[in-house]
Every structure is written in C-alpha cells, then in structure tokens.
Amino acid sequence: MSSSLMSVAIDARMMLNAKKSASAYQIARDLGMRRPTVWSMMHRVRTAMAADPEQNDLLHGIVEADETYVGGKAKNAHNGKPVPKKVPVVSLVSRDGNMKARVVTSVDHKTIKATLKRYVEPTAEIFTDGGTHFPAAVQGYAGHETVNHDAKEYVRGVVHIQGCESFNALLKRSLMGAWHAVS
C-alpha cells in the first residue's frame, strides 16, 4: 500500500474511532502531515461514507423523534452585537439503527410535520417526549406514544426516546471534541 493510501486509511480509522470526532489539527499532528492536506482527506472520507442523497430510505417501525438546540452562548455576544440564537435540530431515530437529523427553521408542528413526512413512513409509530409541537405533527401515522419527562417518566415499557437523546448528546459532544465551541 502506498504511503498516501496508508495515510488515508489511518485518517479514516482515526475519524471513525474518535467518539467525539477528531479535528484536522489533531490528526495532522498525529500523522505528521499538513493540516490542509488532512482537512481535504477528511472531507473525501466523509463524502465516500455519505449515503446517496438520491436514495431516501424512509424510517419505519418505531421511530423516536426529539429536538435539540445547537449553537453559541449569550456570553459570546460582544460589543452590543445581537445574542446568537441556537439552531434547532430535529432528530429521528428508527429502532433498527437508522437515523436522520435535520436543521430546521423553527420547532413548530408544521415544520416537524414536514420533516416527518419527508423521512418517515406513514406506517411508523412515533415516540416523543411531552413536547407540545408533536401531537399535531404526528397525526396520520400508525401511532404516537409519549414519555413525560416533567413527571420524571423516561421509559414506559418499550416507549422511550433514549436513542434520540443519546444521538443529540453525541452530536453536542462531537462539536466539543472537534471544535470546543460553536458560537
């Protein structure tokens, strides 16, 4: 195997093994390469691993849905600049392990309904937390079950959204692992 191909293989391994992601700076230091070269390799590896955007496999069976907010903190607003707003992300995780996460403009029932329609089969059963925006959004699906986090209910039989919450936590930790902050 050539040294450049070996570097790509090692780069891919480091990216995949880093639970909280890995920055191009860190991999460049570890491999003794230039950061722009590693950055380019990382993007090529990600592109090769990406699902075909034309193939939109819909999530089916039991699908967990949740939202999270990603972005800067108010303490990062300086010199009278507006406070940065966090970006809403809707996460959908099928119990078979497939998932979709999309940045949305707002978290309301219309936006969530459109997201569900695009990525989830109508025969799916949707599990959510007690968010008020979900009941209207999931109408037309096979079923809808909720867990009430306000009442400290996190699991009720097979009803939970732990997969979504775990994904959201990993998403935020990966931002911290590679970039330390988003502002």
Where are these regions (language model features)?
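Residue-level recognition of single "structural anchor" positions
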Residues: M1-S183
